[in-house]
Amino acid sequence: MDLISHQPNKNPNSSTQLTPPSSSRYENQKRRDWNTFCQYLRNHRPPLSLPSCSGAHVLEFLRYLDQFGKTKVHHQNCAFFGLPNPPAPCPCPLRQAWGSLDALIGRLRAAYEENGGPPEANPFGSRAVRLFLREVRDFQAKARGVSYEKKRKRVNRQKPQTQPPLQLQQQQQQPQQGQSMMANYSGATV
């Protein structure tokens, strides 16, 4: 009886089959975001090529994505403007959350360079995009009554040792009449 089969191994867990390395969740999301942006450029009127894309086109894309948002952002004239938990529904629009837009821009910025775009011409890192994201963050924070202030690092405050006044320090450092410089160092007195 032949124990070794001469047929190809059909076991999916076998080490003889080559499987492509599984991509991380981040890489998959980055690829989907990149494909969505490229499709947006193709559907743009007139169609845009990637090298001709600028920060203004990225802003158009972000505004386009706003229609698919799920975050309620109150208008300034809404009665619930500035309330973190409004007590009733209102007609204010649903928008993309700032955190989602910020993460999206980060992924697209990386994807642009991975797909051959020069870092110095990256439209996702343009000043206009950075300013837009900052404005969205600040407005959404005001609309919800939440602040996004940067947390400052805590300074490790140790209680400073009290030091004698400068004149007293200088007097202690000068050798007394008849003492050597080493007398203060060793703690010996003459």
Curated annotation (Swiss-Prot):
Sorted UniProt keywords: Developmental protein, DNA-binding, Nucleus, Transcription, Transcription regulation
Fetch the PROSITE patterns from UniProt. Answer: ALOG
Q: What is its main location?
A: nucleus
The UniProt gene name for this protein comes to LSH1
Location of the motif Nuclear localization signal: 150-154
Biased segments, Polar residues type:
1-26, 180-190
Q: Which GO terms describe its cellular component?
A: nucleus
Q: In which tissues is it expressed?
A: Expressed in hypocotyls, shoot apices and lateral root primordia and, weakly, in vascular tissues.
| Protein name (database record) | Protein LIGHT-DEPENDENT SHORT HYPOCOTYLS 1
Q: Where is the composition biased (Low complexity)?
A: 158-179
Keyword flag Transcription regulation: yes
Q: Name one GO molecular function term.
A: DNA binding
